[in-house]
């Protein structure tokens, strides 16, 4: 049976950003020990270190607004590559910050986990 990679990517991103915005300390189940996050210039490996980094970000409230979401199959094994652009509203700031994020999703017992995650704010 063929996987609708666009639907999986959209569902994953909606879940990920809703969880991030409500309680990012609970994102650990989406990562594994071999997962890697590049957040701006910091590189971290492993679910524990990744969640520790995300939970320690210096803001209380955040809201992600997705502008674009593109997905492609990334291997014959069902991996999915996802590219997201959007805006972040942080704490009480009125001006949103633009961001880009890439996820490499790996199938895992009927679900997916994040193997690679690259996040970058876009300043311009």
Curated annotation (Swiss-Prot):
GO biological process: nucleocytoplasmic transport; protein transport
Pfam families (alphabetical): NTF2
Alphabetized InterPro entries for the sequence: NTF2, NTF2-like_dom_sf, NTF2_dom, Nuclear_transport_factor_2_euk
Alphabetized UniProt keyword annotations: Cytoplasm, Protein transport, Transport
NTF2 domain ranges (all copies): 8-121
Compartments where located: Cytoplasm
GO cellular component, one term: cytoplasm
Disulfide bonds listed in the record: none
Gene3D superfamilies: 3.10.450.50
Role description: Facilitates protein transport into the nucleus. Could be part of a multicomponent system of cytosolic factors that assemble at the pore complex during nuclear import.
Listed name of the protein: Nuclear transport factor 2
Biological source species: Candida albicans
